[in-house]
């Protein structure tokens, strides 16, 4: 027998000893263990219940209320879309506030920003637009582009051009990127950075040559080239 091996009765004694120690440990700490396990279960059930009975109904209610505000927005009634028509038909401001954490509230921030921009309230519009958050290639770049518009109106040209270029890069599409690049080019011209403006106009011509912007950007390009001489 190897000196590493135990006689059978010694092995059984060792197992019994471990079992006894385990029983003693549970006797001493069993209450704490049960409480800890129960706490985990309660938290898990609480999260499920919160999602099922609070978050889901909240999101559904927010989405339902968005329809009325969106109808006002589509009709060009910015003030009504923003402020709402009372408790039964709140506007984007109230939806964003009352249903925080839902997709509808997130989108309401974007709508609020657009309405405020149209009203000439650029600082307030900027604040609302910055509260919007999404990771996709259509709405998020469009909001980023409008942030650039707000910054231009506020005279923050350096920040504006960064916002436009970020929007163009995030979208990387014929539908959004060309307009963002042209807006950035216009700002670069205001800043006297004609070389950068020319580079962006050329990008529209070459990379987005099938878009309507590619047909009209020639005028921007000629102007920037003339001013840059």
Annotate each predicted stretch with a short phrase:
Residues 1-39:
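N-terminal positive-inside, membrane-proximal cytosolic segments immediately preceding the first
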Residues 56, 96-105, 119, 133-141, ...:
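Short solvent-exposed coil/turn linkers within tandem alpha-helical repeat scaffolds
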Residues 78-79, 85, 122, 157, ...:
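TPR-repeat structural position
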Residues 100-157:
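Structured, soluble extracytoplasmic/luminal domains of envelope-associated proteins
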């Amino acid at each position: 027998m190897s000196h590493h091996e135990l006689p059978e009765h010694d092995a059984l004694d060792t197992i019994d000893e471990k079992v006894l120690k385990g029983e003693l440990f549970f006797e001493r700490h069993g209450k704490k263990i049960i409480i800890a396990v129960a706490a985990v279960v309660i938290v898990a059930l609480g999260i499920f219940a919160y999602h099922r009975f609070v978050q889901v109904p909240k999101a559904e209610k927010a989405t339902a209320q968005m329809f009325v505000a969106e109808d006002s927005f589509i009709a060009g009634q910015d003030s009504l879309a923003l402020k709402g028509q009372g408790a039964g038909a709140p506007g984007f401001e109230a939806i964003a506030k009352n249903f925080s954490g839902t997709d509808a509230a997130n989108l309401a921030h974007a709508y609020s920003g657009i309405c405020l921009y149209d009203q000439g309230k650029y600082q307030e519009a900027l604040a609302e637009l910055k509260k919007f958050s999404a990771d996709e290639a259509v709405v998020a770049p469009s909001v980023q582009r409008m942030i650039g518009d707000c910054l231009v109106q506020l005279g923050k040209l350096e920040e504006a051009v960064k916002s436009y270029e970020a929007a163009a890069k995030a979208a990387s599409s014929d539908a959004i990127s060309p307009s963002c690049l042209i807006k950035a080019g216009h700002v670069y011209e205001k800043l006297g950075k004609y070389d950068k403006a020319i580079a962006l106009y050329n990008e529209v011509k070459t990379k987005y040559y099938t878009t309507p912007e590619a047909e009209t950007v020639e005028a921007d390009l000629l102007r920037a080239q003339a001013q840059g001489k």
